[in-house]
Amino acid sequence: MHYQEQMESLMLGEERRRGNYTRDVDADADEGVNSPSSFPNSPDDSDRRSSSSSSRRGLSKHYKGKSQSFTTLAEALTVEDLAKPENPFNAKLKQRRESPHCRRLSGCGGASERNLSVHDVFLAGNDRPPRLSGNRPPPRAQTLSAAHISALLTRT
């Protein structure tokens, strides 16, 4: 089978599936063109085989139709139809990152947004360094002199 014949059979099968098929079968017979259904591997032949056999394997039993990631220009009525739908999970993540609660408690941005000094950590009664996000190394521990510690203790 030639490449041109294969392409014609695929195009005709696609038109039939969409319901746009307008060619006359008798005209095809007069021209000497084989009908697409006579080709052994035509889309029409595979449609008939898949509908007749009830045992389908893999994703094919769950997935029917085309991917929703792409829209054909012929089916789009407005520009909004061409836009990819937003994933609700990504929208929620974006909303969380932009919330003021996230910035205030720095649960999303890490310790760098808090700008805590060693004195703030010591006065808060927390002897552990602030938790860092990402792959940054922990802050270097600063040694406090005895005079500095006694001055801090007398303030509280």
Swiss-Prot record:
Question: The organism sits in which domain of life?
Answer: Eukaryota
Which BP terms in the Gene Ontology apply to this protein?
Answer: response to oxidative stress
Q: Which GO terms describe its cellular component?
A: nucleus
User: Where are its TM segments located?
Assistant: none
Principal location class: nucleus
Give the span(s) annotated as Disordered. 1-67
Subcellular localization, per the record? Nucleus
Question: What keywords were assigned to this record?
Answer: Nucleus, Stress response
Write out the biased-composition intervals (Basic and acidic residues): 13-26
Q: What InterPro entries has UniProt attached to this entry?
A: OxStress_Response_Reg
Any idea what job this protein has? Answer: Promotes slightly the tolerance to oxidizing chemicals (e.g. diamide).
Q: What is this protein called?
A: Protein OXIDATIVE STRESS 3 LIKE 3
Which species is the source of this protein?
Arabidopsis thaliana (Mouse-ear cress)
Its gene is O3L3
